[in-house]
């Protein structure tokens, strides 16, 4: 596995979003607005971030 990590922050509310997008955000380990999660930098995680890119911000 890769040793690189990526930090993501939830910057937009989940109210009114699709259920699948809410599940993706939960899968990224994000709960509340402005919460930050540090994850392994893998293609699966990158795909999840890309799917909900309008809700999250990549910090590093």
Curated annotation (Swiss-Prot):
Q: Name one GO molecular function term.
A: structural constituent of ribosome
| Keyword Ribonucleoprotein among UniProt keywords | yes
* Single biological process term from Gene Ontology: translation
Which positions form S-S bridges? none
* Statement: the UniProt record of this protein carries the keyword Ribosomal protein: yes
Q: Which domain of life is it from?
A: Bacteria
Q: What is this protein called?
A: Large ribosomal subunit protein uL30
